Amino acid sequence: AQRGHSVRLWVDDDDALDWMAPLGHPHVQVAKWSGAENTSEIGDVVIEAFGCKLPAHVESLIAKQGSTWINLEYLSAESYVLKSHGLASPVMQGAAKGYNKWFFYPGFETGTGGLIRETDLKQRQSTFDRDAWLARYVQPASNTNSHSKPLWISLFCYEPDALQAFIEQLASST
C-alpha cells in the first residue's frame, strides 16, 4: 500500500492490527475472514499467508480470473528456502484444481524473496542518532553503574520455555 497498490487484507481478528496501524492506511481495506465467502472481487495477486486455507469460493475466483496466487511462507535463514522460493505448488483438489500457487520465502540471501521494508528506511537509518536514543530511552532505566559497559543483545525468537531463565541468567551475570 505504501507503494500505491490497493490491498484488501482478510483477517480473523482485526483487533490485532490496532497497535500496528491504529489509523489504518488509505489504500488498505481490512475485511473479516468470515465474510470471504461473499466476495465477488479478487485481486490480480492473492497472497495466502502461512498456509491458511482459502475458502473454496475464493479459490474458484482466483482460478477463473487468472490471479497470481502466492503462498507466503515464514522468514527463514534455512538452506531449504533457496531451493523452495519461487517453486510452483500445484493445487491437487478443490475449486482451483490444476492451478498453481507459487512459494514465496522471504529471506536474507539473493535467491529468496528478500525483505520488504519501508521506502524511507535507509534515509531514516542514516539520520538516526543512536547515542541520543540510548540517552533518552535506555540509560535512565538502567541500574548499571557508570563504570561498567553494557552488553547489548538483540534477540529475535519465539518465546521458548527457557527464555525467562536465559534472561535471568544474563541479568545475574553482570
Specify the residue positions occupied by each region the protein language model found.
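A nucleotide-sugar donor-handling region in carbohydrate enzymes
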Residues: 73-165
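Active-site and donor-binding regions of nucleotide-sugar-utilizing enzymes
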Residues: 1-98
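A generic structural signal for short, solvent-exposed coil/turn residues
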Residues: 22, 97, 145, 172-173
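Histidine-anchored nucleotide/phosphate-binding helix
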Residues: 1-4, 162-173
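Generic secondary-structure transition motif, activating predominantly at the C-termini of alpha-helices
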Residues: 51, 58, 62, 109, ...
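Structural beta-sheet core signal
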Residues: 9, 71, 153-155, 174
